[in-house]
Amino acid sequence: MPAKAGARVVVFLECFACTQEGVQKRFPGVFRYITQKNRQNKPTPLELKKFCPFCLKHTVHKEIKK
């Protein structure tokens, strides 16, 4: 029998400031981080404050659906 699927899933965190209009950026585009989360411990979407090299500052990165 196959092993039961784990509770860990891969999630993509997208810079919230890059998706807004009129934000001063170094490069065009949107920056994304790839990480893992435990579905049982964190059922709500992740929101982390991380550095965005496009905006050149620490911004809120929110989980997106892929």
UniProtKB/Swiss-Prot annotation:
Name of a matching Pfam family: Ribosomal_L33
Subcellular location: Plastid, Chloroplast
Keyword Zinc: no
Keywords: Chloroplast, Plastid, Ribonucleoprotein, Ribosomal protein
Keyword Plastid attached: yes
Gene Ontology MF, one: structural constituent of ribosome
GO BP annotations listed: translation
GO cellular component, one term: chloroplast
PANTHER family documented for this protein: 50S RIBOSOMAL PROTEIN L33, CHLOROPLASTIC (PTHR43168), LARGE RIBOSOMAL SUBUNIT PROTEIN BL33C (PTHR43168:SF2)
Assigned protein family: Belongs to the bacterial ribosomal protein bL33 family.
Name under which the protein is recorded: Large ribosomal subunit protein bL33c
Species for this entry: Gnetum parvifolium (Small-leaved jointfir)
Organismal lineage: Eukaryota, Viridiplantae, Streptophyta, Embryophyta, Tracheophyta
